[in-house]
Structures are given as structure tokens and as C-alpha cells.
């Protein structure tokens, strides 16, 4: 389920490192987290939508890889992002 432009803009302004930042790991993880939460809500209603479930698993894996990258590059930014989004730290492959 794609995000609309207003939601993307709001997420970018909230998590951007500087003006016009669209590609930092923080922004990417925040957008993926929003899509994951939207798909999770969809799957609560539509339990047999296996195509969307596969898409959800792909998004979760992509977010996990981005979090692993951020934890390896800058652990303080990783911890701040995880706390801000309310993600379990185990989501990044055990980086604590």
C-alpha cells in the first residue's frame, strides 16, 4: 500500500537530517515503518490476503537491513531512531 504525497512529506520533514533529505536511513526506515504498520492493519481485517503478507515480509526485511547498516555505521543514530519509532532493537539483527 503506497503512501500518499502528504504523508511522505510529513515523514521526511520529521526524520530528515537536513533540508531536502529524502534518502538518509532514518527517512527510509520511517517510511518503511509507516507502510509496515498500514499493511499490518490491513492484514488484521483481511487474514487470507497472502500477497500482501508476502509484501509485508519483504518490507520488514528491507527495514531490518537498513537498521543493520545504520547500527554498523553510527550506533547513536541507530539507537535514537529505534527509540523514536518504538521498534524493538532485535529488529536490527541483535544490535544492542
Swiss-Prot record:
GO terms for biological process: translation. GO terms for cellular component: cytosolic small ribosomal subunit. Keywords: Ribonucleoprotein, Ribosomal protein, RNA-binding, rRNA-binding. CDD domains: Ribosomal_S15p_S13e. GO terms for molecular function: rRNA binding; structural constituent of ribosome. It holds the Pfam family Ribosomal_S15. It comes from the Bacteria. The keyword rRNA-binding applies. InterPro entries: Ribosomal_uS15, Ribosomal_uS15_bac-type, uS15_NS1_RNA-bd_sf. One of the primary rRNA binding proteins, it binds directly to 16S rRNA where it helps nucleate assembly of the platform of the 30S subunit by binding and bridging several RNA helices of the 16S rRNA. HAMAP family: Ribosomal_uS15_B. PANTHER family: RIBOSOMAL PROTEIN S15, BACTERIAL AND ORGANELLAR, SMALL RIBOSOMAL SUBUNIT PROTEIN US15M. Belongs to the universal ribosomal protein uS15 family. Part of the 30S ribosomal subunit. Forms a bridge to the 50S subunit in the 70S ribosome, contacting the 23S rRNA. This is Small ribosomal subunit protein uS15. It comes from Streptomyces griseus subsp. griseus (strain JCM 4626 / CBS 651.72 / NBRC 13350 / KCC S-0626 / ISP 5235). The gene is rpsO.
